Amino acid sequence: RLGERVAAGSTQTHRGSKESSYWANPFPLLKDNDGKILAMRAKNYANVGAYLSSRGTLPPVANLGTAAGTYDVPAMHIDVTAVYTNTNPLCPFRGNGRPEASYVIERLIDLAADEIGMDAAELRRINQIPPEAIPYKTALTFTYDSGNFGDNLEKGLVMGDYAGFAARREDSKKNGKLRGIGVSNSIERAGAPSLESAEIRFDATGTVTLYAGTTQQGQG
């Protein structure tokens, strides 16, 4: 209609084709007086846009099995509802489902820490899955076969100078700026199942032919 060629950059393409937005409404964690997590519940809403794309329902549910993150959560209940809106269709980007799952548990922990007056890093520390509990079966069916999550947390706190944050925040206030800090522990599963297959054929001449399928992972 324009009578001219149109070339869209990455920003225009993201805004005009598909997007990866997500709504999460976490409920408070059930915890004891010492901050130990007893149960988790969340009701999440996924904005799938005006039309459902081929994989539009993947981001809200792709990583629910690890929604507990690296924390020992004995009981969990998560409800996910996909809703149509007047926005672009939802499409998986890199890290499909991982940020969504991590956000829920990490946000709940931050809210719980504020509620009981405990440092957010300390609350994470006392709820980490201990190495001796591995292999660990989560309340949402996944089993973690390896991991030293507490050690990872401590290294991250040191590298990010978590202990020195209060002083940095005060310096920012003096300059009329606000400074915040966040902590997030994420876990990644490997070898997710797919529909690929392999076939070996032997012919009369003794030649062996191997047919193997592969799935592109989006790394170029």
Model feature map: region roles:
Residues K18-S20, N33-A62, E115-E154:
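Molybdopterin (Moco) oxidoreductase catalytic core of the xanthine/aldehyde oxidoreductase family
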Residues Q128-T207:
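Helix-loop-helix junctions that connect adjacent transmembrane helices in secondary transporters/permeases
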Residues P92-I134, F202-V208, G220:
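Long hydrophobic segments that form regular secondary structure
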Residues R1-N33, L90-E115, T138-D161:
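Glycine-rich and small/hydrophobic secondary-structure elements
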